[in-house]
Amino acid sequence: MKEIIQKTLLKNGLYAGGILAAYFLVLYLTGVNFFTFSFVSFIVEATVVLIFMFMSISQVRKMTEEKKINFGHAIILSGGVMLIGLFCYQAMKLLVLFVIDPAYNEVCIDEIYFKSIQAIKEYPQYADKMGNPEDIKKLLLIENNLMQFAIFLGKSIIVGALVALVAKKKDKPEDSLIAQ
């Protein structure tokens, strides 16, 4: 069982991470400001990761003799797939933003910075709610971007547990036919 889980977790985590890394490369190569695509990126991340999380649990369930998976194995699978996928995605972002083309990061951050300054000038009554535009410049520091890895660990545990609960209780059509 341990080998099945390890193989499935690594394979599906790397697939999810590869897709997300390719998505970021497409954003970079097209010259799009990835900050302005944050909502779209969230939807892409969530969709890809959730698909591979559920797929992993289903694959392991089918490979076991009793066609069942316990909650512990399900949470390890789903959380691990999410962690590996998001880790690969963040590694690609850091590679592009701080090694391959740091100027791209600066251009994206400057664009957001100037938009926030402009918004504060146009709507001074909301300036206190918009926050300090200088905080945006902190994204140029690699230390602030490395924190994402710790955040991904927490997210993976929480979302992994929720997915494990849903996927473990999910009735398969073949299971309900056999029971009748």
Predicted feature locations:
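Short, charged juxtamembrane terminal tails flanking transmembrane helices
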Residues: 1-4, 169-180
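Transmembrane alpha-helical insertion/packing segments
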Residues: 1-61
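Hydrophobic, lipid-facing residues on alpha-helical transmembrane segments of integral membrane proteins
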Residues: 10-26, 47-48, 75-91, 150-166
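Short helix-capping/hinge motifs at transmembrane helix termini and TM-loop junctions
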Residues: 31-32, 97-101, 167-171
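Membrane-helix interface/capping segments
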Residues: 57-73, 98
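Functional transmembrane-helix hotspots
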Residues: 91-123
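Low-complexity, acidic polar-rich segments
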Residues: 119-134
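Individual transmembrane alpha-helix segments
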Residues: 133-154
